[in-house]
Amino acid sequence: MKKGITLILSLVMAVTLLAGCGASGSEDGSAESGDTAEVQLSGAVALNGSTSMEKVVGVLGEQFMADNQGVSVTYDATGSGAGIEAASNGRADIGLSSRAVKDEEAASGLVGTTVALDGIAVIVNAESAVADLTVEQIAKIFTGEITDWSEVGGAAGTISCVGREAGSGTRDGFESNTDTEDACKMDQELTSTGAVIEAVAGNPNAIGYASLSSVEGKDTVKAVTVGGVECSEATVLDGSYEIQRPFVFVTKADAELSAQAQAFFDFATSTAANDLIRAAGAVPVAK
């Protein structure tokens, strides 16, 4: 009889355990955790545009790929104008521009989202005696009204102006801040930020302009103060440094981004990216 009771109790316990297991699963017997499975991203994200944004998109892309190993972020440094066009015609998921989207571009269906701010540093050769210029002096130098360094406190020598090509976001930002649109007289018009820095570094009488993020750490050129104000993250953010511009992601209003491109966009425009943007020498704006 004891054996019979023991067997019955064992059967009851087994049924109870099975019932408990069934209650924690779905109707088809599969377990449900209650948590949505994490989506694994894959595919490519194509970025195209501003050469000045190279450091910023470089660190953002590297971090995003480290966090999402199935995704490849590519960057084609073509300049702001070409990047905006690439976003418009679908050759890029996200266009990169170092100027704001113009009214006519917005009217065509493009949307600009500011990722960061960047100071445009006015640079001279590292050996130059000139350390400070006003916005007015800078404008007069680039429009040809001031032609010799002795006119602004430097050693005598004919000033050589180095700038970017038409369509460059850096050039657009520089000219709009110095009120020199279509008036600059360049000795050299170059197609990348790096080329401008290299040209100024190689000519003791040269002056140029370049992204703050590209100039930091360079000992072959120096950034002059503008009206006594240094070009830095703090002075760009508080507005006291006058020559600055935005770093912008350009997308199409009527086109949905791929899952991986949208995830990259969301990451780059969030506070999670602030330290990376700052480390790249730009000023984050996400709050």
Regions found by a protein language model. Name each.
Residues 16-20:
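C-terminal motif of bacterial Sec signal peptides marking the signal peptidase cleavage site
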Residues 14-15, 130:
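N-terminal hydrophobic signal/anchor transmembrane helix of membrane proteins
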